[in-house]
């Protein structure tokens, strides 16, 4: 079940104010954020946002196709290291 339309999309207030300030200046800086639950809005297109993945900040360049998605979708939190090489031998 999605979010109610009358509420609107969730965006962190601090992140939104930083984006608006940069849009007024016309400046393109990397913005650090821990808010993975924030929805990407059309005002964010063209900016690079460093999203925290639990260990470090992953730079995410926002394009038009990303609008409506969450920031956390583009910063994976887990790394797949592969299965064990001798996995077939241990099954026998």
From Swiss-Prot:
PROSITE patterns: RIBOSOMAL_S19 (PS00323). GO terms for molecular function: rRNA binding; structural constituent of ribosome. Signal peptide: none annotated. It comes from the Bacteria. Coiled coil: none annotated. InterPro entries: Ribosomal_uS19, Ribosomal_uS19_bac-type, Ribosomal_uS19_CS, Ribosomal_uS19_SF. Disulfide bonds: none annotated. One of its GO terms (biological process) is translation. Keywords: Ribonucleoprotein, Ribosomal protein, RNA-binding, rRNA-binding. GO terms for cellular component: cytoplasm; small ribosomal subunit. PANTHER family: RIBOSOMAL PROTEIN S19P FAMILY MEMBER (PTHR11880), SMALL RIBOSOMAL SUBUNIT PROTEIN US19M (PTHR11880:SF8). Protein S19 forms a complex with S13 that binds strongly to the 16S ribosomal RNA. Belongs to the universal ribosomal protein uS19 family. This is Small ribosomal subunit protein uS19. It comes from Rippkaea orientalis (strain PCC 8801 / RF-1). The gene is rpsS.
